[in-house]
Amino acid sequence: MTKMDIRGAVDAAVPTNIIAAKAAEVRANKVNWQSYLQGQMISSEDCEFIQRFEMKRSPEEKQEMLQTEGSQCAKTFINLMTHISKEQTVQYILTMVDDTLQENHQRVSIFFDYAKRSKNTAWSYFLPMLNRQDLFTVHMAARIIAKLAAWGKELMEGSDLNYYFNWIKTQLASQKLRGSGVAVETGTVSSSDSSQYVQCVAGCLQLMLRVNEYRFAWVEADGVNCIMGVLSNKCGFQLQYQMIFSIWLLAFSPQMCEHLRRYNIIPVLSDILQESVKEKVTRIILAAFRNFLEKSTERETRQEYALALIQCKVLKQLENLEQQKYDDEDISEDIKFLLEKLGESVQDLSSFDEYSSELKSGRLEWSPVHKSEKFWRENAVRLNEKNYELLKILTKLLEVSDDPQVLAVAAHDVGEYVRHYPRGKRVIEQLGGKQLVMNHMHHEDQQVRYNALLAVQKLMVHNWEYLGKQLQSEQPQTAAARS
């Protein structure tokens, strides 16, 4: 992996400002363990250990104690956490656990060893805390779970992993709702604090996705749609960076690159790149683009990503970026790599590749291929390939798009397909395309109405030569009557 990979590990483990500030406050409020002992809420063994542990100031002293008494440490932390209900004390214990792990990643093993003896999993003690009311407690528990899962010798699996990933998705979705202006219950938490807590959740995801097995589990849990939902809404640049970082991590796996084709990732990232004013966001987008082209083992997959980048006019953006100076040499290297690869793809680009890429991007425009008689004569039948993949996208756009230009071009293309492919009418009817085109004959946009009308006529008429003459004479009147 690259240098940036190491930086990312640090990014993901560092707490957000609000959590760092609260943790400092929590550390300063020492707990009176003696009162808990007198109230018989904790054992003398746990009381004695925690007081000795607190007295170890230097990392060396602490490390020495953990090496000889690691099992007791895990046992005491977990006993205190499960037997004390006072929120302030629970916060204090969680902060101690988090500090202990952050100082040395290998210390996760003391929790794994203790859990094994109790026939539990290391994270089973922390997962229930995700349901608590206090946001600091919840997010500290979430960070500890991520560290145990990412740095431990055992993988989180099954219902535990599903539960944790669902919690992450719910938190990220709440950010998505906030971005879209929908009211979200956050109690007395300000939107600034709330967004920092969501950044902490994103940090947990970044840490998890560094492990290949968790990448597959996240994708299976529909996690990519969750990430795309956050990116498609207005979110701060830090969260934007973290979500794209997560995509970059996913794209280290060739199988993931294959799977990610089905999501409209390139258009979304190219839009963000266009507007980006933060170098770290630009850097991570370029690194993700590079992974898509470099890590994909299938030539067809690489070509599809390259075409999508060309279609979204990334070449022009790269040429502009190349003129700028960067502190980070990774950026310059990635720009050079992408320009070279996309330059090669442009040389090989056929009109059908261009059409296919435009259609898959969902951003249809009146590019020359749509009006080219030669293109349709040679390629109409190719829309049937891969079980009508492109036709299904075309009909889907007619169903879901609210962009008049996309609808007009899609209706036009349906008409051209049935005109040039003898059995096209039946295929379009089976895909529900005929009804979708007819629905747009009364659209408020004149271009949509006109192209839908033409497509319906092509679906109905058998004599194309006669229809062509009719359309030539009707076009001006139709346009005037509809406008």
Swiss-Prot record:
UniProt keyword annotation of Zinc present: no
Membrane topology: Peripheral membrane protein
SUPFAM superfamilies per the UniProt record, alphabetical: ARM repeat (SSF48371)
InterPro entries cross-referenced by the UniProt entry: ARM-like (IPR011989), ARM-type_fold (IPR016024), ATPase_V1-cplx_hsu (IPR004908), ATPase_V1-cplx_hsu_C (IPR011987), ATPase_V1-cplx_hsu_C_sf (IPR038497)
Pfam families on file: V-ATPase_H_C, V-ATPase_H_N
Keyword Chaperone: no
GO cellular component, one term: vacuolar proton-transporting V-type ATPase, V1 domain
In-chain residues carrying the UniProt-annotated modification Phosphoserine: 483
Key words of the record: Cytoplasmic vesicle, Hydrogen ion transport, Ion transport, Membrane, Phosphoprotein, Transport
Record's signal peptide: none
Domain of life: Eukaryota
Compartments where located: Cytoplasmic vesicle, Clathrin-coated vesicle membrane
A single MF term (Gene Ontology): proton-transporting ATPase activity, rotational mechanism
Cross-referenced PANTHER family: V-TYPE PROTON ATPASE SUBUNIT H
Annotated family: Belongs to the V-ATPase H subunit family.
Biological role stated in the UniProt entry: Subunit of the V1 complex of vacuolar(H+)-ATPase (V-ATPase), a multisubunit enzyme composed of a peripheral complex (V1) that hydrolyzes ATP and a membrane integral complex (V0) that translocates protons. V-ATPase is responsible for acidifying and maintaining the pH of intracellular compartments and in some cell types, is targeted to the plasma membrane, where it is responsible for acidifying the extracellular environment. Subunit H is essential for V-ATPase activity, but not for the assembly of the complex.
Quaternary structure, from the entry: V-ATPase is a heteromultimeric enzyme made up of two complexes: the ATP-hydrolytic V1 complex and the proton translocation V0 complex. The V1 complex consists of three catalytic AB heterodimers that form a heterohexamer, three peripheral stalks each consisting of EG heterodimers, one central rotor including subunits D and F, and the regulatory subunits C and H. The proton translocation complex V0 consists of the proton transport subunit a, a ring of proteolipid subunits c9c'', rotary subunit d, subunits e and f, and the accessory subunits ATP6AP1/Ac45 and ATP6AP2/PRR. Interacts with AP2M1.
Protein name: V-type proton ATPase subunit H
